[in-house]
Amino acid sequence: MTTKTVKLLVFLTLLVHGIGHLQGVVSGLGVKFNENSKTQSWLLKGSSERVNRIACLALYLGAALFGIMAALSFRAFLLPHHIWQTFAFISAIFSTFCLVLFPDALAMFFNKIGAIAVNLLIFYSIPFNGMFPSAAFND
């Protein structure tokens, strides 16, 4: 695989990961994707529906924004290139909290599996593997 192909795959993965979390934002706004879609967190059961929806909205919005910013930063579009890993890591943290606290806010089970896979890739690649191997991105 060429360097350009790897860069394109990383960019698209980060972008789709960020955009995918907008489903949770829509759920936080009260739109139901299906009969199982809900914004009630198992941790916030004693709180009102409004508090749950605001928490869902805020967490998924954070994951979406940081995911999109990571993708844009990776391509050095509007944001500096050197901070893309920080944005990706923050997005993965927000995403993990979203998936743990509000597992039914995403439209389909496939969306959850995809988000978990990208989060695991980010958690492995960035802090535990000494950042992404720079050799993969050399031109």
Identify the residue ranges that each predicted region occupies:
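Membrane-interface extramembranous regions
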Residues: T2-D139
